[in-house]
């Protein structure tokens, strides 16, 4: 006999379930489903949602560089205080150079351990505690972009990374204002903290910069998008017609060769035949010498070279024993206390002073002076 569970259902038993389901509207736009209404926030996860806590304890650990040791040691009490509010333990191991976070029996939020892991990762990547602690908020996320392996050449990598920062950090500041994210460029990574929409744009700009696309192009398009988002009508439309289209220009610079060969002037005559070894020996007279004479001559030339090299080496050794030239001793000049008195010049000055009369001139002296002046004028005429 068949069991009641294996019996077939009656006809029309399941039709009522399909009848109750509402048909999906065919003309409904996908953009309306994807858009989030203004002012909507995700409800916070409280202890009432999970009163019994977590079943198992979870932990994450990360290493940090040596230069961050002093800063982490200083701000670690603040890190522990921030994590204790969410019932998460944090330990700093200076010997191993690692940071560890783990849940406790009081932890009620299952996702807080992931946020705590991101916190210690950001602290290891030279992000300040004031910025890194924001990751514990619900509406804030982080992204650590690895850029070290995107460019092979070290010099080219440094140049493109500096292009991302900009002169005096102006490009990075503009990107932070447009995306509402905090961005930190350190070594081979770029750390960003902010909303999800901003992090998506930051990742795109960073990767494009490493692919030799200047960040100013992406910043320009972000500025246009920011203005378009303010318009409620254009929010649900495609923005491709408003965004600028940049053409890629591949300029191939022809590299000059290291060795430049200069062509000689054309001559109809062939080049002169080079002299052979026999011709050289005939010219010097060595060709007619005997074998033992040639050998003796060769040995004499070698000995002469050796003697010259020994003499040069000896001169260089003797240079260390030659004393340096002493500077001539300059005796300090004694200041002469006696001053020479010129008696003759003093006498002349006294005579001139005696001849001079003090006070106004007399009437006779004035008349004589006027006559002398008139005579001088007549002579000039």
Curated annotation (Swiss-Prot):
Which family does the UniProt entry place this protein in? Belongs to the KRR1 family.
GO cellular component entries: chromosome; cytoplasm; intercellular bridge; membrane; nucleolus; nucleoplasm; small-subunit processome
Q: Which gene encodes it?
A: KRR1
Q: Name one GO biological process term.
A: rRNA processing
Record's protein name: KRR1 small subunit processome component homolog
The record's subunit annotation is: Part of the small subunit (SSU) processome, composed of more than 70 proteins and the RNA chaperone small nucleolar RNA (snoRNA) U3. (Microbial infection) Directly interacts with HIV-1 protein VPR. Also identified in a complex with NR3C1 and HIV-1 protein VPR.
Name the Pfam families for this protein.
KH_KRR1_1st, KH_KRR1_2nd
Cell compartment(s), UniProt = Nucleus, Nucleolus; Nucleus; Cytoplasm
Key words of the record: Acetylation, Cytoplasm, Isopeptide bond, Nucleus, Phosphoprotein, Ribonucleoprotein, Ribosome biogenesis, RNA-binding, rRNA processing, Ubl conjugation
Q: What is its main location?
A: nucleus
Q: Which organism is it from?
A: Homo sapiens (Human)
User: Organism's domain of life?
Assistant: Eukaryota
Basic and acidic residues bias located where?
Answer: 7-27, 39-51
Any idea which residues bear Phosphoserine here?
Answer: 3, 5
Q: What does this protein do?
A: Part of the small subunit (SSU) processome, first precursor of the small eukaryotic ribosomal subunit. During the assembly of the SSU processome in the nucleolus, many ribosome biogenesis factors, an RNA chaperone and ribosomal proteins associate with the nascent pre-rRNA and work in concert to generate RNA folding, modifications, rearrangements and cleavage as well as targeted degradation of pre-ribosomal RNA by the RNA exosome.
Residue span of region Disordered: 1-51, 250-278, 309-338
């Amino acid at each position: 006999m068949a069991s009641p569970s294996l019996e077939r259902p009656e006809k029309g038993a399941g039709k009522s379930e399909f009848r109750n389901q509402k048909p999906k509207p065919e003309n409904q736009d996908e953009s309306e489903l994807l858009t989030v209404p203004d002012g909507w926030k995700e409800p916070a996860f409280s202890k009432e949602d999970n009163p019994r806590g977590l079943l198992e304890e979870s932990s994450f650990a990360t290493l940090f560089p040596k230069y961050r040791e002093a800063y982490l040691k200083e701000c670690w009490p603040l890190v522990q205080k921030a994590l204790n509010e969410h019932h998460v333990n944090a330990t700093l191991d200076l010997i191993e150079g690692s940071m560890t976070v783990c849940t406790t029996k009081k932890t009620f939020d299952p996702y807080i351990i992931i946020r705590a892991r991101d916190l210690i990762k950001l602290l290891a990547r030279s992000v300040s505690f004031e910025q890194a602690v924001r990751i514990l908020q619900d509406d804030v996320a982080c992204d650590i972009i690895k850029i070290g392996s995107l460019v092979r050449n070290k010099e080219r990598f440094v140049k493109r990374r500096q292009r991302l920062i900009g002169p005096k950090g102006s490009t990075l500041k503009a990107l932070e204002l447009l995306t509402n994210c905090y961005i930190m460029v350190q070594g081979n990574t770029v750390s960003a903290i902010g909303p999800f929409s901003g992090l998506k744009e930051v990742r795109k700009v960073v990767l494009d910069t490493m692919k030799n696309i200047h960040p100013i192009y992406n910043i320009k398009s972000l500025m246009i998008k920011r203005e378009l988002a303010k318009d409620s009508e254009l929010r649900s439309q495609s923005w491709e017609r408003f965004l600028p289209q940049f053409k890629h220009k591949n300029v191939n610079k022809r590299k000059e060769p290291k060795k430049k060969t200069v062509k000689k002037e054309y001559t109809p005559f062939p080049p002169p035949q080079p002299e052979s070894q026999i011709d050289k020996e005939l010219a010097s007279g060595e060709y007619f010498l005997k074998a033992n004479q040639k050998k003796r001559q060769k040995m004499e030339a070698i000995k002469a070279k050796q003697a010259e090299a020994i003499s040069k080496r000896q001169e260089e050794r003797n240079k260390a024993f030659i004393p340096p030239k002493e500077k001539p001793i300059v005796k300090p000049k004694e200041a002469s206390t006696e001053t020479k008195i010129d008696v003759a010049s003093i006498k002349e000055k006294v005579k001139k002073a005696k001849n001079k009369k003090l006070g106004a001139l007399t009437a006779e002296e004035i008349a004589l002076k006027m006559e002398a002046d008139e005579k001088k004028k007549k002579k000039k005429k």
